[in-house]
Amino acid sequence: MSWNSAHGAAMIAVAQAHEALAAAVDDYVDVFGALRRTGVEVMGQKLGGLLGLYIDGSQGIPGCLVNTGLEEVSMRHTAAHELGHHRMGHGTSIDHQEQSSGRWGEGWPQHEREAEAFASWFLMPRPAARAALARCGLARPESPLDVYRMARWLGTPYATTVRHLVRLKMIDRATEAVWLKHSPGVLKAELAGGLPLGPQAHIHVLKPAAHAATLHVTAGDCLLLTVPGARYDHLPAGLTSTPPDTADQLSFLSSVPAPEQGRAAWVTQELVAGSTVTATTDSAEVFRVILRRTPGREGADRFWA
């Protein structure tokens, strides 16, 4: 079965799933909420080289397991992949880090191609992709850095986002091949400009177009304000202007570079869902973004907090 056929089947299944599960199609998609609504039990635990697994409902309640050793965006993609197995009627499936030793996607069986295509379309429907671009102040992605920033609003892995942009007809195959050579770690370090970041943390670049939007973040993430003339007002509980102190951070600066003071803030575990961060410009205009911290995902999903 070709990838084109897999995407064709997945697009139909995704459209049905979005409607049946009342999932957003023009914003960040809550895949874990969708799994709960469809009756799939979800658990998280460290799984080594395993991405996750799906257990069909032939012996009882269907369930899936996600690897909490992965960063949040990779867990979200894995969860959407397992939801694809469920919605497309596949049997129990174990998903490893690499489906084959060759080129990505080469030699994958039909059900894995369908589930992978489902995951991309479920998390990145066209309206959601356009909304993410708009919040970046973009009409189209013009560089790997644009894709990295776009993926922060979608909650998706960098490489997966690049591949899906071809399906959305926002880039061509030649551009895809070039952009896939870029490491997301290098891209986030470039955007951070020396600001400290842990290995699984991300940098969220907040442009004027992000005003009044909702941003999903993880503890350790950095919010870099790039609204001209703006500085953060009083930071809510769960945000700090003090850089994280981690032994393996990407930068070992003990303080925030002077140009970024008042424009950089880090997320902590104390952030309450629905917190709003505001900034005021030199002309007294107010910029705000609503923040939602993703929970820890160890154990059964009903205990995540």
Protein language model features and the residues they cover:
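Active-site hotspot residues in diverse enzymes, especially metal/ion-binding acidic/histidine motifs
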Residues: 1-305
